[in-house]
A protein has these predicted regions:
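Aromatic- and glycine-rich peptidoglycan recognition patches
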Residues: 6-10, 24-27, 91-137
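Secreted/periplasmic proteins that engage bacterial cell-wall peptidoglycan
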Residues: 1-86, 92
Length: 137
């Protein structure tokens, strides 16, 4: 920045190796095992960087075009609040969408990589890469 202050780092990140080591597993405990947010929280807790409860998450910087650091916790937000739609760990942005580590229960998908496509006009907050932001605590 021109005023001599350090650039703002958006979101909380872990090394991607922390996410990779759980590939193929359903993360979380009890009734939350397999839920998307539980997977993200699990990786961050085991890396020593807990994200806190989802009700405390705040919307940060838009991921698409945001030059986000790999390993950053991201989620879809509505009106600045996390509404339990979807959370993931950012890997990279491609022309087609956001490559992430995630999991979900319906349909059942273990922790793994997938693409959240940039879907113009689609309001599916769980699958549209245009609707994701960094998670701020």
């Amino acid at each position: 920045m021109s005023n001599g202050e350090p650039a703002r780092v958006w979101g909380t990140a872990v090394d991607l190796s922390e996410a990779e080591k759980y590939g193929g597993h359903r993360l979380g405990q009890g009734k939350l095992q397999g839920e998307c947010a539980a997977g993200v929280q699990w990786v961050f807790i085991t890396a020593g960087k807990p994200l806190g409860l989802t009700k405390t998450w705040k919307q940060g910087k838009k991921v698409r075009g945001g030059n986000i650091r790999p390993g950053t916790a991201i989620a879809s937000f509505r009106n600045g609040k996390y509404q339990q739609d979807h959370a993931a760990i950012f890997i990279e942005e491609t022309e087609k969408g956001l490559l992430v580590w995630d999991q979900f229960n319906t349909p059942r998908k273990a922790w793994g990589k997938r693409l959240l496509p940039f879907s113009a006009g689609q309001k599916d907050h769980s699958n549209n890469g245009n609707l994701f932001y960094t998670i701020e605590k």
